Every structure is written in structure tokens, then in C-alpha cells.
Amino acid sequence: MHTPFIVALDFPSKQEVERFLRPFAGTPLFVKVGMELYYQEGPAIVAFLKEQGHAVFLDLKLHDIPNTVKQAMKGLARVGADLVNVHAAGGRRMMEAAIEGLDAGTPSGRMRPRCIAVTQLTSTDERMLHEELWISRPLVETVAHYAALAKESGLDGVVCSANEAAFIKERCGASFLAVTPGIRFADDAAHDQVRVVTPRKARALGSDYIVIGRSLTRAADPLRTYARLQHEWNGGERESTTPT
């Protein structure tokens, strides 16, 4: 988990994943496998990506009763993912159970996968929070509460907007991971996400990792776009033509 860039492999099949990754042959990436791909291909897709030398964020956002989450995480620990997640809204006991499952399922001699919590989806805005989810607190307070709860439950970090990263770090400590989706270049469309930022702004605001999907996976030249991502993250200090 060295590179700060997490590439969202939002594809329906292994064949499309292979096609996208072909230009990056020999370059280890940090990739995200979400529901769409995992539910089609199963654990084999994680094994395939690990064989290719990539780190894997298995983004399934578990949210169920504690024992179910514990048993599920026990299984996911054996799959080989480097990072997994749950919904913080599942509560303290569920998040503690997730860690228990990961500890129990991680093979001897291997580090357990890091586990982070989703605070609020980046498609959630204040109106949706209050009118549809019936949460009366402001969005920023809700995110802060969920982040603190995740920290107290033994998790390694949270998924959050870059705009929330700084105060989460203040509340939970610098080592508590802030993983930020909703990353777009300045000239991209926001699509179905509301709280979006550029790579450069995400770094300035304190994000440890940024998740980039359509801006990269649907680019005409993914390799060049990845280089642009590096360039923006580095504040324009240098630009690489080959991913590192």
C-alpha cells in the first residue's frame, strides 16, 4: 500500500480488467474491487490481481449484524485483500466484530488487511442526510462522529471526502487513514457524486489515499492520465510518463 492512488476497477468482468491493465504491465498499482466486479468474478479476481503484483482494496462496505460481519471478514481475510471496509453506521459492536473476524481469518505470517469505515457516501448531501436518512445533525458532525466511533472500535481509518480529512485527523490522529473517493480532474464531470475534489486539493486537505475511477478508467489514454494524476498530486513539481 505504498502508492496513494487507488484505481477503481469498476468493470463487470475480468476480461475488461485485463484490457484496462494491459498498458500498466509490470507496474504495481493499488486497485479497488467493488461490488460490480466482485459479485461477477468472486475471490478469483482478487487472486488474479495479487498474482499480477497489485495491492487490492476490496470495497464491499459490509453492514450487517456483528456475527455475520465477523464471519464474512474471516473469509475475506483469506482472500488476500490488503484493505477492506464496513459502514460505520453498523455501530461499534459490528466494527469490533469486523476486526475480530480479520484477526481470526488472516493466515499465519501475513499482516491482517487494514479495515476502514465508510462515514457517509460522497453522493450524500445535507438535504439527503436530513430528508431521506432522517439524520438531524449536520453532515460534518455526522462524519466526525462516525470517524471517532471507528477509531474507538479499532479500525485503521475511514472513507471520507477530502473536505473532511483535516478535522478527522485532528480528532483521530495523523496515523488514522483518510481514504478519499470522489476524485475528479478540474475539467471532468462530477457524475453521481456530490462532494468531489481534484487530486491536488485532496492532498492539500490531508487525504492519505485517493480513489479515482471513471476519470482514469474511461480515459482515451489511461497511462497518460495516470501520469497526470501523479503530476497533480505532486503539486506540479514533476511529471512522470511512467507510473511509479
From Swiss-Prot:
Keyword flag Lyase = yes
Pathway-wise, it operates in: Pyrimidine metabolism; UMP biosynthesis via de novo pathway; UMP from orotate: step 2/2
Recorded GO MF terms: orotidine-5'-phosphate decarboxylase activity
State the superkingdom: Bacteria
Q: What Gene3D superfamilies is this protein classified in? A: Aldolase class I (3.20.20.70)
Q: Which reaction does it catalyse?
A: orotidine 5'-phosphate + H(+) = UMP + CO2
Q: Report the enzyme's class at the first EC level.
A: lyase
Annotated Gene Ontology cellular component terms: cytosol
User: Coiled-coil annotation: which residues?
Assistant: none
Known InterPro entries for this protein? Aldolase_TIM, OMPdecase, OMPdecase_AS, OMPdecase_bac, OMPdeCOase_dom, RibuloseP-bd_barrel
Range of residues in the leader sequence: none
| Active site (UniProt) | K61 (proton donor)
Tell me which residues bind substrate.
10, 32, 59-68, 122, 184, 193, 213-214
Q: Which GO terms describe its biological process?
A: 'de novo' pyrimidine nucleobase biosynthetic process; 'de novo' UMP biosynthetic process
Q: Which PROSITE patterns match?
A: OMPDECASE
State if Aminoacyl-tRNA synthetase is listed as a keyword. no
Which UniProt keywords are present, listed alphabetically?
Answer: Decarboxylase, Lyase, Pyrimidine biosynthesis
Function as written in the Swiss-Prot or TrEMBL entry: Catalyzes the decarboxylation of orotidine 5'-monophosphate (OMP) to uridine 5'-monophosphate (UMP).
Q: Which family does it belong to?
A: Belongs to the OMP decarboxylase family. Type 1 subfamily.
Assembly with partners or alone: Homodimer.
Name this protein carries in UniProt: Orotidine 5'-phosphate decarboxylase
Q: Which organism is it from?
A: Geobacillus kaustophilus (strain HTA426)
What broad taxonomic lineage does this protein's source fall under? Bacteria, Bacillati, Bacillota, Bacilli, Bacillales
